[in-house]
UniProtKB/Swiss-Prot annotation:
Keyword vocabulary terms for this entry: Chaperone, Cytoplasm
Keyword Transmembrane included in the entry's annotation: no
Family per record: Belongs to the ViaA family.
Protein name: Regulatory protein ViaA
Organism expressing this protein natively: Photorhabdus laumondii subsp. laumondii (strain DSM 15139 / CIP 105565 / TT01)
Length: 485
């Protein structure tokens, strides 16, 4: 069976122009035009998919087989194409019969040409073949358009699903063009999922919008950067000037009172002690210790002294922003409103990760660990699975932090920021684990953040974190926040 690409090649049909035409028609559709006007960032992300669409359409044409009747007609055309005049007239009745049997669009015109009285037989043969070729090109082009039209409708249906999902999530996720592009890529994995999954993402994004302080807290945490001092490799000698005090040879004037053993400058009170027999030994003791009160004469000389000393320069460098490893406490005390806040906070960090091209990994810790990779190609699917979880487990913070440290050892999680969301009502951490965390903070510049959802968290546990972010979910705090907004 002849493929469509082969037929295009033999008939010199430019399939690239037809693909360009079908894509332009697709982009000009009213559905896309309205969406592009509303979400310009997603438009730029969608336009990056055009080369992929062209490749897919070319592959579809390459794999397509032409109809049997068209293949039979083309093979008959090839046989006559190189035939001489005698053979052409000999086969002409069979050609007309075959064209009529397969119901070729060229059949009627072929009958008219065959009955036409043209004196030159070569002219009739040339005209017949030219008209037949035009008919074959027209049939092939029509088949092309039918095939591409089917692909366009299918692509438009998929785009409408992606546009609906991306458009709903655009306000919460698309902070810049990079975030819009990653959101568009991740929306591909959501096409076959239920409407409930999509509504779950929208529900938590709306909840986050209702909690502006929680959203602001995520912004502060996500955008924070630590600064580290980096010593320069080369040491330099720099002149250092100091002031030295040296005694002057010639005293000039009385400048105060001091302690010395200078008999000539004794104060009268000291001479009076010498005249009292009971205090005479006290006078000699002060004399030996040079503690007699005497007049101090101005005779000190101060001069500058410059020496070369080695100096090490330090440069302040901002630590590069790394990925997020978010540890979420799913114990019973983190249920209800705490659960909603924790999930919404994770969505806010995912927004920052998409905007800054950072990875985002979630670990749910109870008595075990459940992992979700939110920045993967199926990130939205992972996010809906995470949001559908319920918090009814226990609390094993030590095991979660140990797993986080192991995760940080992987190359792709270098310079990661660990974020622990909990009420921190948990058991005391082992000393060995605390020592590991301190080493990571001190020597490898890793940062550990605590997001406390309760005012009753244990200070001993939270002391290991670089930053502690408080978001009290108690009834009083919730009412105060609602009253303020």
């Amino acid at each position: 069976m002849i493929s469509l690409t082969t037929l295009d090649l033999l008939l010199s049909i430019n399939e690239g122009e037809m693909i360009e035409e079908i894509i332009l028609t697709l982009l000009a559709s009213p559905q896309l035009a309205i969406f592009f006007e509303k979400h310009p960032r997603l438009k730029r992300a969608l336009l990056k998919d055009i080369p992929g669409w062209k490749h897919d359409l070319q592959q579809r044409i390459k794999e397509a087989l032409i109809p049997v009747t068209l293949a039979e007609e083309f093979q008959l055309y090839q046989q006559i194409l190189s035939a001489n005049t005698n053979y052409f007239y000999l086969k002409l009745p069979d050609i007309l019969e075959t064209l009529n049997r397969i119901e070729s669009p060229f059949s009627e015109e072929a009958q008219k040409l065959a009955t036409n009285t043209i004196a030159d037989s070569n002219t009739l043969q040339t005209l017949f073949i030219q008209r037949w070729r035009i008919s074959l090109i027209l049939q092939t082009t029509t088949f092309h358009k039918q095939l591409l039209e089917q692909e366009k409708e299918q692509l438009l249906a998929e785009l409408q699903q992606k546009l609906t999902l991306s458009g709903n999530l655009d306000p919460v996720f698309s902070e810049n063009d990079r975030a819009a592009g990653r959101l568009w890529d991740m929306s591909k994995s959501q096409l076959n999922h239920s409407q409930n999954d999509k509504q779950l993402l929208i529900h938590y994004s709306e909840f986050l919008h209702q909690q502006p302080e929680l959203k602001k807290l995520a912004q502060l945490l996500g955008r924070s950067q630590s600064v580290k001092s980096k010593p320069q490799e080369n040491h330099f000698f720099e002149p250092v000037t100091t002031i030295e005090r040296t005694p002057d040879i010639i005293p000039e004037q009385v400048n105060g009172i001091g302690q010395s053993d200078d008999i000539l400058r004794l104060l009268p009170i000291e001479l009076a002690i010498l005249g009292i027999e009971d205090l005479e030994y006290e006078f000699y003791r002060k004399l030996v210790e040079k503690k007699l009160l005497t007049y101090r004469l101005q005779g000190d000389n101060w001069r500058e002294k410059t020496t070369l000393q080695p100096v090490t320069h330090y440069s302040q460098e901002e630590k590069p922003q790394g990925p997020f490893i978010i540890c979420v406490d799913t114990s019973g005390s983190m249920g209800k409103f705490n659960e909603k806040c924790a999930k919404a906070f994770c969505l806010a960090l995912l927004r920052i990760a998409l905007a800054d091209n950072r990875n985002c990994h979630i670990m749910l810790f109870t008595t075990g660990i459940v992992h979700y990779e939110l920045s993967s190609p199926d990130g939205l699917e992972q996010a809906t699975r995470f949001l559908s979880q319920t918090f009814k487990g226990g609390t094993d913070l030590a095991f979660c932090l140990t797993s986080t440290i192991e995760k940080m050892k992987e190359k792709c999680w270098k310079n990661a920021d660990a974020v622990v969301i909990s009420d921190f009502i948990a058991q005391r951490l082992p000393n060995s684990l605390i020592h590991q965390i301190k080493n990571l903070q001190l020597h490898q510049q890793y940062r550990f953040h605590a997001v406390s959802m309760s005012q009753y968290g244990k200070p001993d546990i939270m002391r290991i974190f670089d930053h502690i972010w408080h978001f009290d979910t108690g009834l009083k705090s919730r009412l105060l926040r609602k009253w303020r907004h």
